[in-house]
Swiss-Prot record:
Species the sequence originates in: Pseudomonas aeruginosa (strain ATCC 15692 / DSM 22644 / CIP 104116 / JCM 14847 / LMG 12228 / 1C / PRS 101 / PAO1)
GO molecular-function terms, A-Z: ATP binding; ATP hydrolysis activity
Record-linked CDD domains: ABC_Iron-Siderophores_B12_Hemin (cd03214)
Protein name, UniProt field: Hemin import ATP-binding protein HmuV
EC number in record: 7.6.2.-
Oligomeric form and interacting partners: The complex is composed of two ATP-binding proteins (HmuV), two transmembrane proteins (HmuU) and a solute-binding protein (HmuT).
Gene: hmuV
PROSITE patterns assigned to the protein according to its UniProt record, in alphabetical order: ABC_TRANSPORTER_2, HMUV
Keyword terms: ATP-binding, Cell inner membrane, Cell membrane, Membrane, Nucleotide-binding, Translocase, Transport
Residue intervals of the ABC transporter domain: 2-238
Record carries keyword Translocase: yes
PANTHER family in UniProt: HEMIN IMPORT ATP-BINDING PROTEIN HMUV (PTHR42794:SF1)
Similarity comment: Belongs to the ABC transporter superfamily. Heme (hemin) importer (TC 3.A.1.14.5) family.
Protein task: Part of the ABC transporter complex HmuTUV involved in hemin import. Responsible for energy coupling to the transport system.
Gene Ontology cellular-component terms listed: plasma membrane
Amino acid sequence: MLRVENLSIRRGGKTVLEGLELELRPGEMLGVLGPNGAGKSTLLGALCGELEPAEGLVLLDERGLDDWPGVARAQRLAVLPQSSSLGFAFPVEAVVGFGRLPHSSGRERDVQIVAEALAAADASHLAGRSYLALSGGERQRVHLARVLAQLWPGEPGQVLLLDEPTSALDPLHQHTTLQAVHDFARRGASVLVILHDLNLAARYCDRLLLLQNGRPHLLGTPEEVLRPEPLRAVFGLEVLVQRHPERGHPLIVAR
């Protein structure tokens, strides 16, 4: 479990994230929403230890991130940044296999996990190809498989952080990707995902954090957060909110 207490981040003498209290629960998928510059990627940088808090704490299983040895932390915490690039023609299986480096599970088990992670990311058909020959969306799915393999099969105490994992994907694979992440959370891992698409967030996330100007504006269920008033206040967007006729979650339509 990952817990944040009174978190503030300063960059270049400016406070870019302030006053955040957050707990990622086992088995939960939490979405982070907000306009450009709201502090979403800054939050992810703080949660993975890349950015040092000016105030507050980030605790992984009640221990500060710096108190974890590198390998032990990598066995519990995986991060998919907004963009991941490799300049070498590694086979797809090797790229996904990088996620197994913190583990000592043996080659046979690692090969099995790589195959299972590729299947979960709907990328099994990419096996055997060179990473450099893939499209942007295919590369994004391979990197998703890599971070899934790092924590596979997912269990309480593990945390997966994803920064816009659907940004390069077509509509079908936006859904298959978020369904894979949702299924991974249901195995017990805690998942935080940064998204821009409000309807995808409504469909797949258990709770949503709405950020505005580096501060939390609202934290709650999709039904609590995705209402006309908060969306107008944060995005300046006039919307209609309806109930999905089949699934029951909020359905947002711009006026």
